[in-house]
Amino acid sequence: MRLIQNMCTIAEYPAPGSAAAADCCLGAAGRRLVKIAVVGASGVGKTALVVRFLTKRFIGDYERNAGNLYTRQVQIEGETLAIQVQDTPGIQVHENGLSCTEQLNRCIRWADAVVIVFSITDYKSYELTSQLHQHVQQLHLGTRLPVVVVANKADLLHIKQVDPQLGLQLASMLGCSFYEVSVSENDNDVYNAFHVLCKEVSHKQQPSGTPEKRRTSLIPRPKSPNMQDLKRRFKQALSAKVRTVTSV
């Protein structure tokens, strides 16, 4: 079984800063759009992770990744957001460092948030995480891009090369959230990882006046006087005054 939901490829997407890219800030039906790139070494399960998030299914047979862009809708704090998830080809590491194509760099620049995936069965993919995080932040100078680190294949303990605690420590050092998942066995942690990113991006996208509005909305406003209530109180006061005069 194969899932191919190719919306467009990285190369076809509008360049950041262009008018076309600005038009893509809103998804279908005018919903706010959250763009997420999933990156990591080859064979760590990036495509399987994306498909799990999209369909809650594990599909073990995939065509070679051509940079597919997937979409779905997610409820975040009562608001329906349009989510675009960009799957990417595996990153290679050479003696001089990361080997990132311009297409991949463009994908990272395009994204509002990034999921960095490594496999607990591949120590080199774990070592790549720190370099990849640094590369992501360099492509977003002046702003700290939300990033989640995901350790995949948690079910393959018999061949693990990376203790999950190392992933947690690394993510903490990088200032990222961390999730250990088994894409083949569970979809809850996968969904939570994406949900955290969507929530963080959603908060960053709020207009400057919105946070204040949200804070003040938590404080009960004094109710405006109700005219019917005022009339009722006035009649009660008047009746009491009349009774007092009559008794005298």
Swiss-Prot record:
Record-linked SUPFAM superfamilies: P-loop containing nucleoside triphosphate hydrolases
Name of the protein this chain belongs to: Ras-like protein family member 11B
Keyword S-adenosyl-L-methionine listed: no
EC number: 3.6.5.2
Entries under NCBIfam families matching the protein: small_GTP
A GO BP annotation: negative regulation of transforming growth factor beta receptor signaling pathway
CDD domains, A to Z: RERG_RasL11_like
PANTHER family reported for this sequence: RAS-LIKE FAMILY MEMBER 11
Residue ranges of the region described as Disordered: 205-229
Entry keywords, A to Z: GTP-binding, Hydrolase, Nucleotide-binding
Region (Small GTPase-like): 29-246
Reaction catalyzed: GTP + H2O = GDP + phosphate + H(+)
GO MF entries: G protein activity; GTP binding; transforming growth factor beta receptor binding
Pfam families according to UniProt: Ras
Similarity field: Belongs to the small GTPase superfamily. Ras family.
Organism field: Bos taurus (Bovine)
Amino acids binding GTP: 40-47, 87-91, 152-155
